[in-house]
């Protein structure tokens, strides 16, 4: 049991709105759970279904087996692709090995994949703005065989060398800092005036909304706690947004990670959560902050999200068939 020393005496807790799960994460988790209900364990999941330790451990306890590469799954097994998406090479490998696939790629990531295919088919080279090594970036870069470049900073743009400067397009990772992505996109357009931009921003609605909510939250607080795992891109961006507003901010996996010293003398403590962090963790953090002396909790005004994505047709069809037999 955690100690209840008082370090945040009489502080107010402010909750960002919106926060936590997005439609793509809800859908991805639902796909794994439904696959387990239909087929039983084990269900193999390539990479973490979403970047949250609590979610991954919960699904592991239900029978999901998380693997790094497809050759770790037996031939013919059921495999779920994570919400971050996969390359064409991974899809080809799954087909060659006879794996039965449920694709949990976020539809907003799939939108970027379609843009890449369309632009490459038109003969354009593509610059992707994103973080090297992130699964989403690897999946998007793997939608084409060559003709793609990755940049992360304005400095990367200055150093970029492309084959055909007059025939370029760009796309972005969906979970970037809105402000950082805008700066890099601006640098691309300044250096390559004819570069084709996405018809609609590739940064997803949930990333945008959660960053906007923190921009409203941070000026009201002297500390912001962001609930999310360290490998979550969008959660890290929320911490950065708060820090850029001049507020101390920490990224935490849950209530157990709170250092009471952080709360010493704080009068207003903001709490938000990345798009892959469940609300149960937020409420545990609120309870812990109350134990440490906070006396009130208030939710900031903000957007009420109503976005929902359907399950893959193959999975929803099997669910319907099963339910019709009951």
Curated annotation (Swiss-Prot):
Gene Ontology BP annotations: dimethylallyl diphosphate biosynthetic process; isopentenyl diphosphate biosynthetic process, methylerythritol 4-phosphate pathway; terpenoid biosynthetic process
UniProt catalytic activity: isopentenyl diphosphate + 2 oxidized [2Fe-2S]-[ferredoxin] + H2O = (2E)-4-hydroxy-3-methylbut-2-enyl diphosphate + 2 reduced [2Fe-2S]-[ferredoxin] + 2 H(+); dimethylallyl diphosphate + 2 oxidized [2Fe-2S]-[ferredoxin] + H2O = (2E)-4-hydroxy-3-methylbut-2-enyl diphosphate + 2 reduced [2Fe-2S]-[ferredoxin] + 2 H(+)
Organism (species): Bordetella bronchiseptica (strain ATCC BAA-588 / NCTC 13252 / RB50) (Alcaligenes bronchisepticus)
Record-given protein name: 4-hydroxy-3-methylbut-2-enyl diphosphate reductase
Gene that specifies this protein: ispH
Binding positions ([4Fe-4S] cluster): 22, 106, 204
Keywords, ordered alphabetically: 4Fe-4S, Iron, Iron-sulfur, Isoprene biosynthesis, Metal-binding, Oxidoreductase
Free-text function comment from the UniProt entry: Catalyzes the conversion of 1-hydroxy-2-methyl-2-(E)-butenyl 4-diphosphate (HMBPP) into a mixture of isopentenyl diphosphate (IPP) and dimethylallyl diphosphate (DMAPP). Acts in the terminal step of the DOXP/MEP pathway for isoprenoid precursor biosynthesis.
Cofactor dependence: [4Fe-4S] cluster
């Amino acid at each position: 049991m955690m100690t209840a020393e008082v370090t945040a005496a009489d502080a107010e807790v402010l909750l960002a709105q919106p926060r936590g799960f997005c439609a793509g994460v809800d859908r991805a988790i639902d796909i794994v759970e439904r696959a387990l209900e239909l087929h039983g364990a084990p269900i193999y999941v390539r990479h973490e279904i979403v970047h949250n330790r609590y979610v991954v451990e919960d699904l592991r306890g239900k029978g999901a087996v998380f693997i790094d590469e497809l050759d770790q799954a037996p031939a013919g097994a059921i495999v779920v692709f994570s919400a971050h998406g996969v390359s064409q090479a991974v899809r080809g490998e799954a087909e060659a090995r006879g794996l039965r696939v449920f694709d949990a790629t976020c539809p907003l990531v799939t939108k970027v994949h379609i843009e890449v295919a369309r632009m490459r088919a038109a003969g354009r080279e593509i610059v992707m703005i994103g973080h090297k090594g992130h699964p989403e970036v690897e999946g998007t870069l793997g939608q084409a065989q060559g003709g793609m470049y990755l940049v992360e900073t304005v400095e990367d743009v200055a150093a970029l060398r492309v084959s055909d400067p007059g025939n370029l397009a760009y796309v972005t990772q969906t979970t970037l800092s809105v402000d950082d992505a805008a700066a890099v996109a601006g640098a691309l357009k300044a250096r390559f005036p004819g570069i084709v931009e996405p018809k609609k921003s590739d940064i997803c609605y949930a990333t945008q909304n959660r960053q906007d909510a923190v921009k409203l939250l941070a000026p009201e607080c002297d500390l912001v706690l962001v609930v999310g795992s360290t490998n979550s891109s969008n959660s890290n961006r929320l911490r950065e947004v708060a820090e850029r507003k001049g507020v101390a901010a920490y990224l935490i996996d849950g209530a157990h990670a709170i250092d009471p010293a952080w709360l010493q003398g704080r009068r207003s403590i903001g709490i938000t959560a990345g798009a892959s962090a469940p609300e149960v963790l937020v409420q545990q953090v609120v309870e812990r902050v109350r134990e440490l002396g906070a006396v009130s909790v208030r939710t900031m005004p903000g957007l009420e999200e109503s976005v929902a994505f359907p399950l893959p047709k193959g999975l929803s069809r099997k669910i319907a068939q099963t339910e019709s037999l009951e």
